[in-house]
């Protein structure tokens, strides 16, 4: 088989964001990262994914860290490599829709504090939910990596994703990311999809997958043959070293320094061992589980699902919940399982199993999704489930959900005037009004560390609420 591209394959390393989100419930601290940042910067990666996703919430909720300060610290030590973040479209980094002015301000502050590339996705692939974030990222000089949330269903096929990619390119995307959060993209399908995308759009293609089902390495290799431009690797993703060694001496040789990778790996193995000893990194998430191809559960959802069941004392229901997830997903119109739909579907599945009766209880987020408040669901919602949730057909939202929201930023500035010390604080408070106030109060009443190179003593919040 011949490579369809002769350009070196570019690599984004995810150790600073997705690796610990998917395997350790997002509990890696900035002190865990600091000793390796300059080594990571020297390896030659295209970019480092270091921020966004669940890290923002977890910094304040569990680690007692300011997420904005984390970003500034990483930027200070990573001078040569692009930094990128994961951004949930109109949900920003939260779990509901925010007004356009809040989305705009968050993009502005993310770029101002050090982000170069914003990977923007919508859990439902509703492009209306990406419009503002794409516009704002370009407005403030960032690069837009618009995302296809990959999944498998009667609706989601190759033609669907090719059409979506073309639409995103026309909206201004600088790159297109295939976000295979549950490791469902099989090797031959990856070859076919990447080839079709390269024939349809002119912007670079970036592939993000996992190794949950054991196919990740093969998927990346076949994508490399098909001409993919950039791939994600790391701890939760397929191993960087394996791919670099595989392509060495070929036309797609990455040119990355395996020796420096080894130095970084030694450090992060020690961090992983500490997290495992503390019971935070559960060995279950390190195993290959081919049942993923049935359950379609992404890595980040898996580790937090385990955490949620532990807290409820229902660990024995783990596989029952996994089996319930695809049933709920079908009833909800086949949403891809990525934040926030993964949390919504996952929590509904947990409730269905724990309560002993399906749909006895509907969390408010489930009702909001069934009502269309998150956007248009890809497929047909089970009308019996929607009716059981108390939603009449005429109540379903059909417009862009954010069009129903009035500007909010000035309201938040006034509301948090006495507490917020900066616009960054205002945004933290706007997104996480239950978590950010106590974090900011605690932050502002403890002494600053001498320097970011000296580990600070921080209080760890104990919060029984799972961020699934």
Regions found by a protein language model. Give the residues of each.
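N-terminal amphipathic alpha-helix/helix-capping segment at the start of soluble metabolic enzymes
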Residues: 1-24, 71, 76
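Short amphipathic alpha-helices and their capping/turn segments at secondary-structure boundaries
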Residues: 1-4, 36-41, 70-77, 221-223
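Conserved, mostly hydrophobic/aromatic
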Residues: 11, 19, 40, 120, ...
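Active-site beta->alpha loop and helix N-cap motifs at the rims of alpha/beta catalytic domains
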Residues: 52-169, 173-176, 182, 186
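Catalytic alpha/beta core domains of metabolic enzymes, predominantly
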Residues: 181-360
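Terminal or standalone catalytic/regulatory effector modules within metabolic enzymes
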Residues: 35, 41-59, 282-292, 296-468
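Glycine-enriched alpha-helix->loop->beta-strand junction motifs that scaffold or abut catalytic
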Residues: 44, 114-116, 140-142, 170-174, ...
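Alpha-helical segments flanking ligand/cofactor-binding loops in enzyme cores
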Residues: 38, 108, 135, 166, ...
């Amino acid at each position: 088989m011949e490579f369809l591209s002769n350009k070196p394959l570019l690599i984004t390393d995810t150790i600073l964001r997705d690796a610990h989100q998917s395997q350790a419930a997002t509990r890696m601290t900035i002190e865990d990262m600091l000793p390796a940042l300059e080594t990571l910067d020297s390896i030659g990666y295209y970019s480092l994914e270091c921020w966004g996703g669940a890290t923002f919430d977890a910094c304040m909720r569990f680690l007692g860290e300011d997420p904005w300060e984390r970003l500034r610290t990483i930027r200070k030590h990573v001078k040569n490599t692009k930094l990128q973040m994961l951004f949930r479209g109109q949900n920003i980094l939260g779990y509901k829709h925010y007004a356009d002015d809040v989305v705009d301000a968050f993009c502005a502050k993310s770029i101002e504090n050090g982000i170069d590339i914003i990977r923007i996705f919508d859990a439902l692939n509703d492009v209306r939910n990406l419009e503002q974030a794409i516009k704002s990222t370009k407005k403030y000089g960032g690069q837009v990596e618009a995302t296809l949330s990959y999944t498998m269903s009667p609706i989601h096929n190759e033609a669907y994703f090719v059409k979506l990619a073309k639409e995103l390119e026309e909206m201004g995307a600088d790159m297109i990311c295939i976000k295979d959060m549950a490791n469902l993209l099989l090797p031959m399908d990856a070859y076919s999809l990447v080839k079709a995308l390269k024939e349809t759009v002119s912007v670079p293609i970036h592939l993000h997958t996992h190794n949950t089902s054991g196919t990740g390495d093969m998927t990346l290799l076949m994508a490399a043959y098909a001409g993919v431009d950039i791939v994600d690797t790391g701890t939760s993703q397929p191993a960087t070293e394996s791919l670099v060694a595989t392509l060495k001496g070929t036309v797609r040789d990455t040119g990355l320094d395996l020796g420096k990778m080894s130095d970084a790996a030694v450090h992060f193995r020690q961090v992983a061992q500490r997290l495992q000893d503390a019971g935070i990194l559960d060995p279950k998430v390190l195993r290959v589980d081919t049942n993923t191809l049935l359950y379609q559960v992404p890595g980040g959802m898996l580790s937090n699902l385990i955490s949620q069941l532990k807290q409820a004392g229902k660990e024995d229901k783990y596989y029952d919940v996994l089996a319930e997830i695809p049933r709920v997903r079908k009833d909800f119109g086949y949403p891809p399982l990525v934040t926030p739909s993964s949390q919504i579907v996952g929590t509904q599945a947990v409730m269905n199993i724990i309560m002993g009766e399906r749909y006895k209880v509907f969390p408010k987020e489930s009702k909001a999704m069934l009502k269309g408040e998150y956007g248009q669901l890809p497929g047909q919602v089970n009308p019996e489930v929607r009716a059981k949730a108390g939603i009449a057909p005429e109540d379903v939202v059909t417009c862009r959900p954010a069009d129903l929201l009035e500007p909010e930023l000035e309201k938040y500035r006034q509301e948090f005037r006495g507490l917020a010390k900066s616009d960054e604080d205002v945004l933290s408070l706007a997104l996480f009004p239950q978590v950010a106030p106590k974090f900011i109060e605690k932050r502002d009443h403890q002494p600053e560390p001498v320097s970011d190179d000296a580990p600070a003593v921080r209080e760890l919040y104990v919060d029984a609420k799972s961020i699934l």
